[in-house]
Amino acid sequence: MFLYTNTGLYDTIIQQYLKALKEIEIMVKILFVCHGNICRSPLAEFLMKDLIKKQGLENDFYIESAATSNEEIGNGIYPPVKRILNDRGINCANKRARRMTCADYDNFDYIICMDSYNLRNMNYIVSDTKGKYSRLLDFTKNPHDVADPWYSRDFATTEREIEQGCNALLKHILNNLK
């Protein structure tokens, strides 16, 4: 009743709401995906957030990560990955593994996986009808899978490749916004 009697206030509230919605829609939303969401995808999430912040673009991007499996749901980031991030001054303490959902497909502009196995499993969760799925290193000059350091134990190579992929992905996105 109050809103109808004070149309000026009602109009102001609606205008603020519409402005907030537009700001959200302008934001580029990226979801990084790997098998368990404890190594590669959270590493990509936090390296990309750091890259975006250093570019002064943190208000223009929303970034998360998820898993294709249920195996690690609720667990924190794997300790060697946490050390990599901590050594860079990046806080990841509150990150917990979660599984990709069908709703993620509608909520994110880019859904970026680490390898072909992830890509196949993402399509089992929800088919890529809008062309949102890519492997991270597909944006580089040398497209290939990011090896899983859980098995390879080569965290340095994984870190280097993910950093290269994030830089290439950001360049791709910014070029396509123009």
Residue ranges of predicted features:
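Short, positively charged and aromatic/hydrophobic N-terminal segments
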Residues: Y4, D11-Y17, E23
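Compositionally biased, intrinsically disordered low-complexity segments enriched
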Residues: N6, Y17-K19, K82, K178
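Feature targets compositionally biased, intrinsically disordered low-complexity regions
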Residues: T7-Y10, K19, K130, Q164
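Conserved active-site segments centered on acidic
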Residues: E25-N107, K171-K178
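Phosphate-binding/catalytic loops
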Residues: Y110, S116-K178
